[in-house]
């Protein structure tokens, strides 16, 4: 069973001849990772397309269109980042840094309550490199705007407010955590975070380069019940 592939790869087919080969593969000796100890190779396979839709399917065209869509999304993200980069520059220049080094711009002043320490707050966020490149958001419209929309994430209900612990000991980058703790329910802010209060010299995988200054848009939508 491969549940990690659910919703990602869907292949439907039926073996019409050669069931004995499948039985042999199923009984092949396996290693500790449940893989055959010796490589099993398909030397020839014949796919029979039944039905009008199946016969009309053009794999080469679909393959080429996929990469065209990727290029369009990439261009969309680059253009959106350019606009946001200029906005970041103007805004940051007018803000005064807090003692830690972060700068906070109040976008919306909410009328909700101030969370108590150790409560879970529901948060919408969008994280950017300082050049305006979006690296992550749980807001569907933002990811669409920057060509980052993920259909799998959407199917898994990943575009919704995420619970974060409202406490100084939360496992968040320091700059994000400090900004979050200044907020009450309904507040929307934009916080400029120096790399030392972000992911520092290490960066984060291939998403955030080392020594990257970051910008986050943060909104507390509610307190988790």
Give, region by region, the residue ranges found by the protein language model.
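Cross-family detector of peptidyl-prolyl cis-trans isomerase
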Residues: 1-225
């Amino acid at each position: 069973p491969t549940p990690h592939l659910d919703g990602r790869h869907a292949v439907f087919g039926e073996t019409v001849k050669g069931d004995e080969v499948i039985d042999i593969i199923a009984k092949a000796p396996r290693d500790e990772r449940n893989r055959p100890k010796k490589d099993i190779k398909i030397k020839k396979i014949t796919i029979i397309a039944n039905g009008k839709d199946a016969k009309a399917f053009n794999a080469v065209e679909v393959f080429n269109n996929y990469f065209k869509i990727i290029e369009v999304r990439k261009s969309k993200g680059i253009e959106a980042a350019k606009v946001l980069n200029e906005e970041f520059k103007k805004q940051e220049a007018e803000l005064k840094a807090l003692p830690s080094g972060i700068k906070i711009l109040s976008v919306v002043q909410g009328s909700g309550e101030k969370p108590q320490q150790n409560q879970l707050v529901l948060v919408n966020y969008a994280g950017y490199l300082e050049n305006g490149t979006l690296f992550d958001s749980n807001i569907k419209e933002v990811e669409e705007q920057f060509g980052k929309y993920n259909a799998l994430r959407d199917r898994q209900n990943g575009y919704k407010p995420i619970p974060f612990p409202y406490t100084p000991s939360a496992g968040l980058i320091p700059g994000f955590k400090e900004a979050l703790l200044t907020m009450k329910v309904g507040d929307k802010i934009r916080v400029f975070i120096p790399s030392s209060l972000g992911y520092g010299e290490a960066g984060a995988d291939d998403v955030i380069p080392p020594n990257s200054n970051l910008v986050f848009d943060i909104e507390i939508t509610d307190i988790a019940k």
